[in-house]
Amino acid sequence: MIVFSSLQIRRGVRVLLDNATATINPGQKVGLVGKNGCGKSTLLALLKNEISADGGSYTFPGSWQLAWVNQETPALPQAALEYVIDGDREYRQLEAQLHDANERNDGHAIATIHGKLDAIDAWSIRSRAASLLHGLGFSNEQLERPVSDFSGGWRMRLNLAQALICRSDLLLLDEPTNHLDLDAVIWLEKWLKSYQGTLILISHDRDFLDPIVDKIIHIEQQSMFEYTGNYSSFEVQRATRLAQQQAMYESQQERVAHLQSYIDRFRAKATKAKQAQSRIKMLERMELIAPAHVDNPFRFSFRAPESLPNPLLKMEKVSAGYGDRIILDSIKLNLVPGSRIGLLGRNGAGKSTLIKLLAGELAPVSGEIGLAKGIKLGYFAQHQLEYLRADESPIQHLARLAPQELEQKLRDYLGGFGFQGDKVTEETRRFSGGEKARLVLALIVWQRPNLLLLDEPTNHLDLDMRQALTEALIEFEGALVVVSHDRHLLRSTTDDLYLVHDRKVEPFDGDLEDYQQWLSDVQKQENQTDEAPKENANSAQARKDQKRREAELRAQTQPLRKEIARLEKEMEKLNAQLAQAEEKLGDSELYDQSRKAELTACLQQQASAKSGLEECEMAWLEAQEQLEQMLLEGQSN
């Protein structure tokens, strides 16, 4: 089992965990939840032996095999399938030993190694690796492509598959759905439900957590609180605990007030001084109960749009694509106030293309898009985070939209999105991805849109912010079109589901459970097609055409690959600078008055590295998205 005992973890002068205690039994599947920045990822880093505890202890069996998702993937020439198989380290070691034994012609060693390979089911490893990759959205053709051919999002899927193929005793997953579409999320959920080891899962997706985990550890107020059951059960139990805590707090406050009243009345009287003194000591010894805080720190709503024209947007026989490649054909869509549409479809089918088309970021190849007079778009996509001005604060961004408004009104509004105190005037270059996403949403909400277009709006958002966004969208009066892998948000905010598939956009007759069945049926059909003989598959001309297309795609994507490689080197350098600064800041002696100048320099190095790293990461993300889109188009040709 894993035991955390009186654990203390600091980051510089900030305490993340203090005297925290928790236990995880073998085979348990634990959801690790809490606000962004509370220490969830730091706790996983502790288990991975990447950091040390500042106090207390933690233990788990030394024989346990750990697996986690690597965050970096070099541009390797190695085939995707072989890269994933590398995740089974014991298999690779035995494979190397077998090669050496064959070279020596050592029959005894060969027999022994074959026995070990049999014991770990080595002969099925290629099919197991292929199955993992298929589940995560890779085609048969992609299995043999080099890792360097894939964009960042797809490389993260390769890293995830590499972690899953490891025959681990303890699997650590930190937001594994961030780079996945809904199809892959559904597949991963099924895989994790059948996982036999111990799982610690960080996720802000309640629908993903619920069917998987049987325990929740909630990091709050520098402590770890344990709850048996899934996330929905945790919410009920926590509400009960907080209600009890509040009742105890109020009861204690009454007792404190009574004692204080006695002390104030009789302290000066000689006949009662002794009794008053005893009550003073009683107050001093009393362990005060904190009041319960259950409020969501985020609170906002969409103000009523200035107008609600009907229809807001109309499409007639619209086709869309990139260059000569048609992604969507003959789209017919009518959006009116109150339309609430969730887009479903496999990766690369064209969901984001449709959103861009609706937003006016992509011109139609043919057909007409009719926009109502008075339409006001609110468009959210991940690349918009880069449009924030790095040298400006949240209040400066908002003031440009509302130059006539009083500063206090702007501050009050931003407070609903979690920007309070100094955060309101802090430059966005220092912001995390979640903070930037919240600011972009705040700017959208302020403008009172009547048509909302949201492409994966919950990426980077924690559970509290997701809930606040969901509640605001439920009350939104205009039209909504959303792409999301967050099924709770889709269920709560949409009335109709549309399927983007085979160049078409059509109403889907069913719910999200029916969509899972549809995915399964399509996968079976494709597997049958793959197994069927194809007359031209091995023809010389087909191979020649395929090589030509691959060469053209490599040439087209080469500038982006070079830029991505440059950014990765820069991020590596900045990460090293940041690690160096944070290591120094972890030294308590650095905070002595005599080392004030050194501390200031160290803090400046930390801030500069964080700022540069954030800018590089956003540029890297944009380049990766462009590369991913080009590769998806190339694969479909």
UniProtKB/Swiss-Prot annotation:
Residues 523-559 are annotated as: Disordered. Genetic data indicate it may be involved in ribosome assembly or function. GO terms for molecular function: ATP binding; ATP hydrolysis activity. This is Probable ATP-binding protein YheS. Residues 2-246, 313-527 form the ABC transporter domain. SMART domains: AAA. ATP 2 binds at residues 345-352. ATP 1 binds at residues 34-41. Gene3D superfamilies: P-loop containing nucleotide triphosphate hydrolases (3.40.50.300). Belongs to the ABC transporter superfamily. ABCF family. YheS subfamily.
